[in-house]
């Protein structure tokens, strides 16, 4: 192991980008940009210069109109800028992209304080995600939270948009968390511009791509600095191609299953979404005390979470001295943090004593039962993957993609995967994709 390099990774958030991924990102960029010898290119956090090397090679291939090889090299190097904060990488950058005959724009400086006197046509790269320490994630068992790093990729994105020409292009790979509209407002920041294409990777896929050096869902994209139109092309893993997706009205951008979300969209527009029926629970008030065991004082039953035991969903229960929220009400309780696994609390037997569970209240027994059946299918599990913005958590945003089942009069009261696939018009290929996506034989609470 290169100990010095590992220390740089932890200190500066540096994770090398594999060449196959760089190649795929470059394929997003319109070919005419590589042909224009006047365009200026920038990698603002170039590390060893991997992006710069492939951009250089692509420019050399595309700019054959400059017949003289040396003149072509000189022109390209004049317009290709590689920035890196850490002197540690300088020699490696020169090895990858430097040319003894011509000057190279290899600049060792802090990008966030750099003030160039030019604007760029294309900015591309893998910006550092953090500085001053790795970001703590649920799968990072070593790092302590108090040593958590400062997120940098947001600053790099904003700085890069400032440094782009009007109409210029930004192509980065960054965490996927901006794809949901939240308090950070990065969704709004991105969608004000034209998003041409986006390809997303789960936390598992990201970790594999970066050889166990990255632990968060990620995406790469091609953005143009022109007014956005609420449309983009999302990569669909089922069809292995990019599909159109419209995100008007601040609709979240899914990280998975765009073909299915597009199938459901007309029903969401007709019936509304299930989101308004779903309540995300908060922590209980300090006035309520809880205990693991039932005693004379602690008599009120509550759900804290749901776990899997040999693929069987099982509620985790505690007891409180006073009733917790939602006790005494007929409801669905989705307490499993990844798959929900709705429990039908017909008689209001349970309160909810912990945060980040989901509750659906309704007094119509048959429709609530139908909703439980829907949300327990492989169809639903496939949908839940669409909003895995933070590791593998079940996000409330997914319910914006699901039509309001309570209003769908023509939907069978007895639901399974076959019923749903037929109702929403899925073909055999799509049905097979859903049925084979997760093959574990989960035993849910559906009777």
Model-derived features with residue positions:
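Class I S-adenosyl-L-methionine
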Residues: 1-96, 100, 399-445
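C-terminal substrate-recognition regions of SAM-dependent nucleic acid methyltransferases
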Residues: 8-12, 205-433
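Signature of N6-adenine DNA methyltransferases within the class I
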Residues: 10-11, 17-23, 45-53, 77, ...
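Conserved acidic residues
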Residues: 39, 121, 331
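Hydrophobic/aromatic beta-strand patches that form the interior of the parallel beta-sheet core
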Residues: 42, 81-83, 107, 171, ...
